C-alpha cells in the first residue's frame, strides 16, 4: 500500500510539472507517448542499441532499476568499450531555447557502468568532441542536465547521446525526458553570437566568447575545433553579474589551422555551446622573381622591383626594398612607391643582396623577402696613397720598411695593388740611377728591399692602384747603414823598400761603403835570407787616421820579405784585406868589436889578430877579407865606422904595380869563421888566391877586417880596423919581443881565469835549476855579457859579478815560488805525474816565473793534488783544523787591530788597500776624478793580473769604461745578474747596439748566449784616439741568488773559456760581481789555484785567500764560499780538461778506445769511471717533494726521483690541484732549462703530463721507448689521441696531422687549456723514435739517431724554440743520452769542439741516472764522430 501510494504521488507531481513547462518538443517515453512522434532514432554506426524499459510491463524487473518508461543500457550485457548512440531530432531554433534531459547511472558496487556523453552536430557536419559527459555511479535516482545551444538561423543542429561501456561492465545507464524548452537554461549559460576571425599567417588569433548566465554554472571553458581538437580558455573575465567573457588564443597560426571553432562550457549539470565561427588565415605576399638590376655605379645600384607575380594573399598595401652586404650582419629597408628604385650611399666594390618586401593588411602582413638580387658595386678611385712610410730596420745592404695598414676605406676596392718603387745612385761617379718597383703581396704593410749598396740615399715611394685609378705617395729618403768597406785595390799599393824601412802608400777603397774612420796595416816577416831572423815573425799592426794613406815602417830586418795587409775600417768594422809582399834591401854586415882590441901577438914581420864572425843583416856572410894598409905618415887616417871600405879586391902584386897603399892579404870563406879565432897577418900563406906576405918591419900597418854579403846580385860590405902595427926599430927589437911575450902570457892567464869563473857561474846556475829554484835569467844574462865584454879586466871583477848573482838568488821568495823551493825534493817527479794525470793527462805547461806577492805560511802548508780529496774529507768531518776555523782565522787580525786602536787600524787598513788601488787618469779640471772602487790583484806568477771592482752603478759607468781603456783590458768577467732578489745588483753598463759613455763609444759587435753564461764582444773607441780596442765581457748567469752554485762544472768551464780567450799580452782581467768581493774572490782563487795545481801539483788555498784579503776586503765572504772553492778545485783536479777540438777528435777518440794490454782497460772506460765517482748522490732531503705520500703513486720507481731544485711545478689547476710531476728541468749547452726530462706517463699521470707540456711552453716531445714494453712493471700506454680530440683534465689535445718513416713517427697536436681559452693554443710536435730496441742500452743506428736530432732541431727553429720534453721508461739513461747528444752537437756548431764528459757531468748534476751505462757514454762519442764525418762529406 505504501509503495502504491508513493507511485501515485510521483505520477501526480510529474503531471503537474509537464502542465506548467509545456515543452515544444521532446520525448518522455511514457506509456501514452507515441514513440514515433518522439523523433529520436538509434545510431547506425554503433555497437548496440538503447533498450526501452517500461517497469509496469516487467514484473520481474531488478530492484536496481527505477520504475517508469525510459531508455536503458545494461553494461553487464555488453563488452567494454562498446557504444550505443541515440540521435535526437534535428533542431533549427532561432530564439533562445534549452535542451533538457534526465539521466540515470547506477552500479550496486559503486563502479562506473560507463560514460554518457552528449554531442552537438551542426549542419550535418562532423560530430566533433563531446560537449557534455558524465561517468561514475550516481545512485538510484535520476539527474537532470541542460544543453544551451546558441545557433542561429538558418543553421540547424542535432544532439547525439552516446553510452560507452566501462571496463567493469557493471550497472546501468538510463536516459529519459529529453525535452526542448522555449526559455533559457537555468543550469547552463548561453553564448552570444561568435564572429569570424581573420589573421595573417604567423600571428596570434583571438576568439572572445560572451556568455549569459551564472559563471559558477560553468566548471570548464573550452574551444572546440570542428575537426575535434580542444583548446582551453586563456582567461575568463566577468563583465557584469550574469555576463562573462572567455578569451581563447591560438598562437602563430598557420594556413593549416584555418577551420571552424566554437566555445563550450561544461559542468555536471549541463553545457553551453556557441555557434561555429571561422578562423581565416591569410598568407602574406612574396614576389616570385628577384628584382632586376638596371645600372650599377661605385656608390649606387638602380633596380626594378619586378612584383607582378606573387605568392600569397593580397591586397598589397606597401612595397619595400631590403638590402644588406652579403658579408655583413646588418640590413636596411626602404619604402618604395615606384617600380624602379636607386640605392644611394653604397660602398664601392661591395657585394649587396637586395630583396623586395610586400605587405598586405593586418598585423604581420609583411611577407618574406622575395628572391634576392646579388650585385656588386664598382670600384672607386683610391682615397689617397698610403701614409706612414718609415723604416723598421736599416742595415747596410737591406732596408726594411713599413707603412700604415691599407684599409678598405683607403683602397675603396678589394682588387688593388701596392707597388713600392725606389731609386738610388750607382756607378763609380754616382752618375747613374738604379730604379725598380716591387709589387707587394696583398695585405702586406712591410717589405725588405735587399741587395742595396751601403751608405746610400734610397728614395722610396708607394703607389696604390685599383681598376679605377692610382695614387702616388710622397717620396721618402732613407740612408742605408754603413758596411765594412770594400777591399783596397792591390794595384793602388805603392812602396819604396830600404834596408830597415819601407815606405808604403795606398788609396781609399773603391767601395768605401761608409765613412772611412781608420786604416789598419798589419805586417809580418814571412821569409828572410838572414838566418838570425825568425820567420814567420810576430804580426804587428799599425792604425792610421782616415786622411793618412801612407806609412813608414821602421826597425825592419834587412833582406827580409814582409807580408803587408792593408784594410780600411768604417763604423761597421774592417773590410777586405789587400795583400802585398815587400822585401827590404840587405844591409852591410856588423861586427861585434868594441874599441880596437889589442893584438894577440906581434913580431917584426907578423901580427896576430883575433877575427870574430860578423853578423849578416839581411843576407848571410859570403866572404871575409883581411886588408893590410900601409900607414903612411901624412895620410889621412880612416876613422872606425866612418871609413870607406874596400869594394874592389886587390892582390899584393896588383897593389905593387898600381902603387896602392892597401892589398888583400887573405880571403876567407864564411864557413871557416864560425867562431872567433886568431889570424896571423904576414904568415906568407895564400888564402883563396890572395898572398899574405910578411910585413916589412920598418913600416907601420893598419889591419882591416872586411865582411861581405851577397844576395841576388846585391852586395853589401862592411869593414873595421882591428889592429895597428907600428914600425920596428932595431935597438928595441929584442925588448919588444920580450914585451910581446909577457903581454901574451898575461892575456892567456886572464883568459884562463875568466874561463874558470864562467864555468863556475854556469855550474851554479845548473845546480839552482835542478833544485827547482827560479833564477833571474835576465840579470844572469846581463852579468854574463858584462863578463864576456870585459874579459880582459881583473879576475876579482868576475868574482864580484858572481857574488852578485848569488845575492840575487837569496832574494825573498814569493808565495808561488815558495812551493818550488820546498823540501819536497825527490818527491817532485811523482807529484808531477799524479797531478798531470788528474788534470787530464796533458803535459804540464811551462810556467813563467815573474814573482808573486802571495806569501806562504808555516801553519798552513800547501796540499798535494794527490792528497786533496783526503784533505777535504778531513776538513768536512771536522777532523783536524776544519773549514770553520780556517775561515774565521782570516778576520782575526782585523778584530785585534780594531781593539787596539780603531783609528790607527782603520788608517793602516785604508793605506794598505790604497797601495793596490787602481788610479784613473784625472779628468781635466777635476783632480778628484782619479778614484774608482777597484784594486789590482796578482795572478799566478803575474803581477796585477786581475782588477777586482764592484758592479758599476749608473753614475760610475763612465769611470768603469775609462778604467778598461786605460788599463788596456781585453776581458771583463761579470758574476752577477742585473737584478737579484728584487734588488738592483749592477747597472747595465753596456749598450744593445752602440752608445757613447762620456767620450768613449761602446759598440756591441756580437753576443753569444749559452746556458750558463754569455759572451759579448765590444769595440771601444775614444774621442781623440785613433786606436780601437776590442773587449769581451764574460757574463756568468748561473750563480744562484743565495749561496753558491750547487756544482762547479759550469763555473770551471767558464773560467777555462775566459783563460783561453784572453790574449797573453792583454791588460788585467776586470772581475766584478755586485760589491766586487765574495764571488769575485772565489773566481780569482779558482783561477790562481788551477794554475798552481797544473804547474806544481799542489794547491795552497788558505794562503791564497789570506793574501787576497790583504788586497781587498771580504774577498771571501762566507764559509760556504770557502768550502765551495775546495770542492771546485777537487772537481777540476779529478776531471781535468776533457774538451777535444773537432780537428783532433778522430785520432783522440781512436786512442781513447784503445785497450791497454797491462790494465785491460781503455781511457774511455776510465773516464766513465771518473764520471761515476764525481756524480753527486741525492740525499733523501733533496727529494722531499717526490717522497711525500700524496706523490708516491706518481712515481714509476722510488729509486729514480727528481731533486726538489729541478722540479717543474705544474701551474694549470686540475681537481686536487697537485702540482708535482716526476720530471726535471735541465740545461742544454746553449739554453738554460731547455729540456724537461720525465718518465713515460703513467695511467694516473697522463693529465699531469699534458699540463706540464702546456704550462712550460714545450713545443717538442721526444719519446725514446716503445709502447707496452714487456720489461716494464707498468704498461706504457698511449697518452695521445690519434686521430681526433681528447680531454685530459683541463687540457684539450687535438691530433692535427702525422707522418712516419722507418725511424720516426711524427705527430702534430694542438694543445689548449679549456679553462684559459684566452691564452690560445700551443702547437706541439711529438717525435716517437722507433729504432731503440727494448733490451738495448743504445739505439740501433747512429745515423737514424742523428736524423732524430736534426728533425727536432728543425722543428724547434720553426716553432719558436720552446722547451723539449724528453722521456723514456724511467726518464734516465735514454733521455740523458739524447740530451747529451744534443749538447755535443751544439758544442761542435758553436765552438768546433766536443766535450762528452762535460755534457754527461752537467746532466748528472740534475739527475744522477742520466747517461746511465758505459755503452751509452760510448755512444755519445760515436754520435760526435758520426756527425763530424757527415760534415766532411757535405
UniProtKB/Swiss-Prot annotation:
GO terms for biological process: cell adhesion; cell differentiation. Residues 824-851 are annotated as: Disordered. Residues 1-17 form the signal peptide. It is a single-pass type I membrane protein. Glycans are attached at residues 74, 409, 684. It holds the Pfam family fn3. Tyrosine-protein phosphatase which dephosphorylates CTNNB1. May function in cell proliferation and migration and play a role in the maintenance of epithelial integrity. This is Receptor-type tyrosine-protein phosphatase U. It comes from Gallus gallus (Chicken). The lineage of its organism: Eukaryota, Metazoa, Chordata, Craniata, Vertebrata. The gene is PTPRU.
Amino acid at each position: 500500500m505504501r509503495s502504491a501510494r508513493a507511485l501515485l504521488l510521483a505520477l501526480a507531481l510529474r503531471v503537474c510539472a509537464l502542465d506548467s513547462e509545456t515543452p515544444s518538443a521532446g520525448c518522455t517515453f511514457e506509456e501514452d507517448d507515441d514513440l514515433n512522434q518522439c523523433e529520436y532514432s538509434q545510431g547506425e554506426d554503433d555497437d548496440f542499441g538503447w533498450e526501452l524499459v517500461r517497469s509496469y510491463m516487467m514484473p520481474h524487473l531488478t530492484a536496481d532499476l527505477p520504475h517508469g518508461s525510459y531508455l536503458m543500457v545494461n553494461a553487464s550485457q555488453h563488452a567494454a568499450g562498446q557504444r550505443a548512440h541515440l540521435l535526437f531530432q534535428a533542431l533549427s531554433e532561432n530564439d533562445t531555447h534549452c535542451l533538457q534531459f534526465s539521466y540515470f547511472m547506477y552500479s550496486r558496487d559503486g563502479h562506473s557502468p560507463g560514460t554518457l556523453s552528449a554531442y552537438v552536430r551542426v549542419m550535418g557536419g562532423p560530430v566533433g568532441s563531446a560537449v557534455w559527459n558524465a561517468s561514475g555511479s550516481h545512485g538510484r535516482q535520476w539527474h537532470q542536465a541542460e544543453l544551451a545551444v546558441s545557433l542561429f538561423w538558418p543553421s540547424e543542429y542535432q544532439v547525439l547521446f552516446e553510452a560507452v561501456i566501462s571496463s567493469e561492465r557493471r550497472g546501468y545507464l538510463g536516459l529519459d525526458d529529453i525535452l526542448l524548452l522555449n526559455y533559457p537554461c537555468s543550469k547552463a549559460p548561453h553564448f552570444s553570437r561568435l564572429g569570424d576571425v581573420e589573421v595573417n599567417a604567423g600571428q596570434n588569433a583571438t576568439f572572445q566568447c560572451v556568455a549569459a548566465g551564472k559563471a559558477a554554472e560553468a566548471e570548464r571553458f573550452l574551444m572546440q575545433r570542428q575537426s575535434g581538437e580542444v583548446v582551453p580558455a586563456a582567461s575568463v573575465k566577468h563583465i557584469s553579474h550574469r555576463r562573462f567573457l572567455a578569451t581563447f588564443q591560438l598562437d602563430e597560426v598557420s594556413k593549416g589551422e584555418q577551420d571552424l571553432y566554437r566555445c563550450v562550457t561544461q559542468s555536471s549539470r549541463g553545457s553551453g555551446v556557441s555557434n561555429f565561427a571561422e578562423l581565416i588565415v591569410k598568407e602574406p605576399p612574396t614576389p616570385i622573381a628577384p628584382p632586376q638590376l638596371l645600372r650599377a655605379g661605385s656608390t649606387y645600384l638602380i633596380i626594378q622591383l619586378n612584383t607582378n607575380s606573387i605568392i600569397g594573399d593580397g591586397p598589397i598595401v606597401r612595397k619595400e626594398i631590403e638590402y644588406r652586404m652579403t658579408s655583413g650582419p646588418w640590413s636596411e629597408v626602404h619604402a618604395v612607391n615606384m617600380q624602379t628604385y636607386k640605392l644611394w650611399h653604397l660602398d664601392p666594390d661591395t657585394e649587396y643582396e637586395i630583396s623586395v618586401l610586400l605587405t598586405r593588411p593586418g598585423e604581420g602582413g609583411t611577407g618574406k623577402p622575395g628572391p634576392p638580387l646579388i650585385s656588386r658595386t664598382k670600384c672607386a678611385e683610391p682615397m689617397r696613397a698610403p701614409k706612414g712610410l718609415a723604416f723598421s730596420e736599416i742595415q747596410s745592404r737591406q732596408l726594411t720598411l713599413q707603412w700604415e695598414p691599407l684599409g678598405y676605406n683607403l683602397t675603396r676596392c678589394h682588387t688593388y695593388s701596392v707597388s713600392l718603387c725606389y731609386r738610388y745612385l750607382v756607378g763609380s761617379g754616382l752618375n747613374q740611377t738604379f730604379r725598380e718597383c716591387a709589387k707587394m703581396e696583398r695585405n702586406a704593410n712591410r717589405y725588405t728591399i735587399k741587395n742595396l749598396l751601403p751608405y746610400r740615399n734610397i728614395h722610396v715611394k708607394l703607389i696604390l692602384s685599383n681598376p679605377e685609378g692610382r695614387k702616388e705617395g710622397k717620396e721618402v729618403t732613407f740612408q742605408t747603414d754603413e758596411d765594412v768597406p770594400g777591399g783596397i785595390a792591390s794595384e793602388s799599393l805603392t812602396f819604396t823598400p830600404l834596408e830597415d824601412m819601407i815606405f808604403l802608400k795606398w788609396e781609399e777603397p773603391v767601395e768605401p761603403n761608409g765613412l772611412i774612420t781608420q786604416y789598419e796595416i798589419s805586417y809580418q816577416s814571412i821569409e828572410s835570407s838572414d838566418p838570425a831572423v825568425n820567420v814567420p815573425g810576430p804580426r804587428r799592426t799599425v792604425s792610421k787616421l782616415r786622411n793618412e794613406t801612407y806609412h813608414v815602417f821602421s826597425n825592419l830586418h834587412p833582406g827580409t820579405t814582409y807580408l803587408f795587409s792593408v784594410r780600411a775600417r768604417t763604423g761597421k768594422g774592417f773590410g777586405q784585406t789587400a795583400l802585398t809582399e815587400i822585401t827590404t834591401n840587405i844591409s852591410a854586415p856588423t861586427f861585434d868589436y868594441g874599441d880596437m882590441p889589442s893584438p894577440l901577438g906581434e913580431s917584426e914581420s907578423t901580427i896576430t889578430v883575433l877575427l870574430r864572425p860578423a853578423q849578416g843583416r839581411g843576407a848571410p856572410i859570403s866572404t871575409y877579407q883581411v886588408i893590410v894598409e900601409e900607414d903612411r905618415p901624412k895620410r889621412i887616417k880612416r876613422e872606425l865606422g866612418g871609413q870607406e871600405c874596400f869594394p874592389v879586391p886587390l892582390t899584393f902584386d896588383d897593389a905593387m904595380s898600381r902603387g896602392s897603399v892597401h892589398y888583400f892579404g887573405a880571403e876567407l870563406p864564411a864557413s871557416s869563421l864560425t867562431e872567433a879565432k886568431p889570424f896571423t897577418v904576414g904568415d906568407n900563406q895564400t888564402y883563396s888566391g890572395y898572398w899574405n906576405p910578411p910585413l916589412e918591419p920598418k913600416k907601420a900597418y893598419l889591419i882591416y877586417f872586411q865582411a861581405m854579403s851577397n844576395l841576388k846580385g846585391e852586395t853589401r860590405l862592411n869593414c873595421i880596423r882591428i889592429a895597428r902595427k907600428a914600425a920596428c926599430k932595431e935597438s928595441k927589437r929584442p925588448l919588444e919581443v920580450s914585451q910581446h911575450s909577457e903581454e901574451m902570457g898575461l892575456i892567456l892567464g886572464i883568459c884562463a881565469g875568466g874561463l874558470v869563473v864562467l864555468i863556475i857561474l854556469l855550474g851554479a846556475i845548473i845546480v839552482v835549476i835542478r833544485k827547482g829554484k827560479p833564477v833571474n835569467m835576465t840579470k844572469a844574462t846581463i852579468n854574463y855579457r858584462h863578463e864576456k865584454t870585459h874579459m880582459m879586466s881583473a879576475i876579482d871583477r868576475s868574482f864580484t859579478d858572481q857574488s852578485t848573482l848569488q845575492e840575487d838568488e837569496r832574494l825573498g821568495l814569493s808565495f808561488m815560488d815558495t812551493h818550488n823551493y820546498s823540501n819536497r825534493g825527490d818527491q817532485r817527479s811523482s807529484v808531477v805525474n799524479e797531478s798531470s794525470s788528474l788534470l787530464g793527462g796533458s803535459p804540464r805547461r811551462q810556467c813563467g816565473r815573474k814573482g808573486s806577492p802571495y806569501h806562504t805560511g808555516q801553519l798552513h802548508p800547501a796540499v798535494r793534488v794527490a792528497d786533496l780529496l783526503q784533505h777535504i774529507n778531513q776538513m768536512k768531518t771536522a777532523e783536524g783544523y776544519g773549514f770553520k776555523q780556517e775561515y774565521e782565522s782570516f778576520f782575526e787580525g782585523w778584530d785585534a787591530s780594531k781593539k787596539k786602536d780603531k783609528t790607527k787600524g782603520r788608517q793602516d787598513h785604508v793605506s794598505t788597500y790604497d797601495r793596490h788601488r787602481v788610479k784613473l787618469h784625472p779628468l781635466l779640471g777635476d783632480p778628484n776624478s782619479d778614484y774608482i772602487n777597484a784594486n789590482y790583484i796578482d795572478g799566478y806568477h803575474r803581477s796585477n793580473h786581475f782588477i777586482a771592482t764592484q758592479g758599476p752603478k749608473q753614475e760610475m759607468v763612465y769611470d768603469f769604461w775609462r778604467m778598461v781603456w786605460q788599463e788596456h783590458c781585453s776581458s771583463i768577467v761579470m758574476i752577477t745578474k742585473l737584478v737579484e732578489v728584487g734588488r738592483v745588483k749592477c747597472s747595465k753598463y753596456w749598450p744593445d747596439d752602440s752608445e757613447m759613455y762620456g767620450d768613449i763609444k761602446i759598440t756591441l759587435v756580437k753576443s753569444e748566449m749559452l746556458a750558463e753564461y754569455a759572451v759579448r764582444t765590444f769595440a771601444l773607441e775614444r774621442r781623440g784616439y785613433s786606436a780601437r780596442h776590442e773587449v769581451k765581457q764574460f757574463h756568468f748567469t748561473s750563480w744562484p741568488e743565495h749561496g753558491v752554485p750547487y756544482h762547479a762544472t759550469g763555473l770551471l768551464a767558464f773560467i777555462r773559456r775566459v783563460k783561453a780567450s784572453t790574449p797573453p799580452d792583454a791588460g788585467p782581467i776586470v772581475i766584478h760581481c755586485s760589491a766586487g768581493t765574495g764571488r769575485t774572490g772565489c773566481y780569482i782563487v779558482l783561477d790562481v789555484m788551477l794554475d798552481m795545481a797544473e804547474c806544481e801539483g799542489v794547491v795552497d788555498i788558505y794562503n791564497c785567500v789570506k793574501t787576497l784579503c790583504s788586497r781587498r776586503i771580504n774577498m771571501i765572504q762566507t764559509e760556504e764560499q770557502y768550502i765551495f772553492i775546495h770542492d771546485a778545485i777537487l772537481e777540476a783536479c779529478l776531471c781535468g780538461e776533457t774538451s777535444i777540438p773537432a780537428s783532433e777528435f778522430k785520432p783522440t777518440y781512436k786512442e781513447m778506445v784503445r785497450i791497454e794490454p797491462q790494465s785491460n782497460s781503455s781511457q774511455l772506460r776510465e773516464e766513465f769511471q771518473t764520471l761515476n765517482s764525481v756524480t753527486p748522490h741525492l740525499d733523501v732531503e733533496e727529494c722531499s717533494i717526490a717522497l711525500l705520500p700524496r706523490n708516491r703513486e706518481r712515481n714509476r720507481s722510488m729509486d729514480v726521483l727528481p731533486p726538489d731544485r729541478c722540479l717543474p711545478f705544474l701551474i694549470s689547476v686540475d681537481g686536487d690541484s697537485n702540482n708535482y710531476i716526476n720530471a726535471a728541468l735541465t740545461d742544454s749547452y746553449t739554453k738554460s732549462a731547455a729540456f724537461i726530462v720525465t718518465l713515460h706517463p703513467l695511467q694516473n699521470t697522463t693529465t699531469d703530463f699534458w699540463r706540464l707540456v702546456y704550462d712550460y711552453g714545450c713545443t717538442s716531445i721526444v719519446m725514446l721507448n716503445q709502447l707496452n714494453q714487456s720489461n716494464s712493471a707498468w704498461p706504457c700506454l698511449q697518452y695521445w689521441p690519434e686521430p681526433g680530440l681528447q680531454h685530459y683534465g683541463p687540457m684539450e689535445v687535438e691530433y692535427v696531422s702525422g707522418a712516419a718513416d722507418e725511424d720516426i713517427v711524427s705527430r702534430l697536436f694542438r694543445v689548449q687549456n679549456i679553462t684559459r681559452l684566452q691564452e690560445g693554443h700551443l702547437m706541439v710536435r711529438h717525435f716517437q723514435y722507433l729504432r731503440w730496441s727494448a733490451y738495448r742500452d743504445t739505439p740501433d743506428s747512429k745515423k737514424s739517431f742523428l736524423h732524430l736530432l736534426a728533425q727536432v732541431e728543425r722543428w724547434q727553429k720553426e716553432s719558436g724554440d720552446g722547451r723539449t720534453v724528453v722521456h723514456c721508461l724511467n726518464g734516465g739513461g735514454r733521455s740523458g743520452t739524447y740530451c747529451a747528444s744534443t749538447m755535443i752537437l751544439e758544442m761542435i756548431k758553436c765552438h768546433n769542439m766536443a766535450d762528452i764528459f762535460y755534457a754527461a757531468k752537467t746532466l748528472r748534476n740534475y739527475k744522477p741516472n742520466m747517461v746511465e751505462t758505459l755503452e751509452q757514454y760510448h755512444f755519445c762519442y760515436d754520435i760526435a764522430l758520426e756527425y763530424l764525418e757527415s760534415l766532411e762529406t757535405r
